[in-house]
């Protein structure tokens, strides 16, 4: 039995994909057997990693787990491949539509599956803190402000929506503000405001590696699990 996990990285040309490629290559518990990019003219090998165009996804070699940070239009094909091959999937692709989220739930009946808007340890802690604050601050206003780089398309961010769900389940309706500026990696502020006082909970990411490390950690832990839809914090 191999001492490493064979890893497929889907969305390897993106910012997160590049971080995953670099960190996985430095981690002896992984071997990248395929990197899938949307704009590759044909399959090729770079630094020992086989690259495949998105159109060639069905031809990728065997893998033990897939990590996906891509775009919604490429997500469904990867999900179908993982189900067909009975392989776990870890995905951080945001902006999915309702049908894709339904497909995620259905796939969770057949494979171990983790979808998360944010894979940092700090964000997992923030979600927990926000839930606890929601329990204690019924009747307070809640505002969620998220800031990202100018190239991020979806708004509010997936992480902001996750934070909003954490308070919405406590009966608090959050308001969202989205900022797109410069090269901000990701800032999230959750503000609870009452009469004469307010509480602010903040998470700031200064490096994408925190998300990539978290995704790799989750990928290690999801292999061998029974089928199901797991949360990031379930495996942190």
Curated annotation (Swiss-Prot):
The keyword Cytoplasm applies. One of its GO terms (biological process) is lysine biosynthetic process via diaminopimelate. (S)-2,3,4,5-tetrahydrodipicolinate binds at residues 149, 158-159. The active site is at 148 (proton donor/acceptor), 152 (proton donor). Its EC number is 1.17.1.8. CDD domains: DHDPR_N. Pathway: Amino-acid biosynthesis; L-lysine biosynthesis via DAP pathway; (S)-tetrahydrodipicolinate from L-aspartate: step 4/4. Pfam families: DapB_C, DapB_N. It catalyses: (S)-2,3,4,5-tetrahydrodipicolinate + NAD(+) + H2O = (2S,4S)-4-hydroxy-2,3,4,5-tetrahydrodipicolinate + NADH + H(+); (S)-2,3,4,5-tetrahydrodipicolinate + NADP(+) + H2O = (2S,4S)-4-hydroxy-2,3,4,5-tetrahydrodipicolinate + NADPH + H(+). Its main location: cytoplasm. One of its GO terms (cellular component) is cytosol. It is an enzyme of class 1 (oxidoreductase). Keywords: Amino-acid biosynthesis, Cytoplasm, Diaminopimelate biosynthesis, Lysine biosynthesis, NAD, NADP, Oxidoreductase. NAD(+) binds at residues 11-16, 92-94, 116-119. One of its GO terms (molecular function) is NADP binding. It is found in: Cytoplasm. Coiled coil: none annotated. Catalyzes the conversion of 4-hydroxy-tetrahydrodipicolinate (HTPA) to tetrahydrodipicolinate. Belongs to the DapB family. This is 4-hydroxy-tetrahydrodipicolinate reductase.
């Amino acid at each position: 039995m191999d001492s490493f996990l064979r890893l497929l990285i889907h969305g390897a040309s993106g910012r997160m994909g590049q971080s995953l490629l670099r960190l996985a290559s430095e981690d002896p518990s992984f071997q990248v057997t395929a990197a899938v990019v949307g704009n590759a003219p044909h399959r090729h090998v770079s630094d020992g990693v086989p690259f495949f165009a998105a159109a060639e996804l069905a031809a990728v070699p065997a893998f033990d787990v897939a990590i996906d940070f891509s775009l919604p239009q490429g997500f469904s094909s990867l999900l179908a491949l993982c189900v067909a091959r009975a392989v776990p999937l870890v995905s951080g692709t945001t902006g999915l539509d309702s049908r894709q989220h339904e497909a995620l739930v259905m796939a969770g009946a057949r494979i171990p599956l983790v979808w998360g808007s944010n894979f940092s340890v700090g964000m997992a802690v923030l979600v927990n803190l926000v839930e606890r604050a929601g329990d204690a601050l019924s009747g307070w206003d809640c505002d969620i402000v998220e800031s990202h780089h100018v190239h991020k398309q979806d708004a509010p961010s997936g992480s902001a929506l996750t934070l909003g769900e954490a308070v919405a389940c406590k009966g608090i309706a959050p308001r969202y503000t989205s900022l797109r500026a410069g090269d901000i990696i990701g800032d999230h502020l959750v503000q609870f405001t009452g009469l004469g006082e307010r509480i602010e909970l903040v998470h700031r990411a200064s490096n994408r590696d925190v998300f990539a490390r978290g995704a790799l950690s989750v990928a290690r832990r999801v292999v061998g699990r029974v089928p199901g839809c797991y949360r990031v914090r379930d495996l942190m």
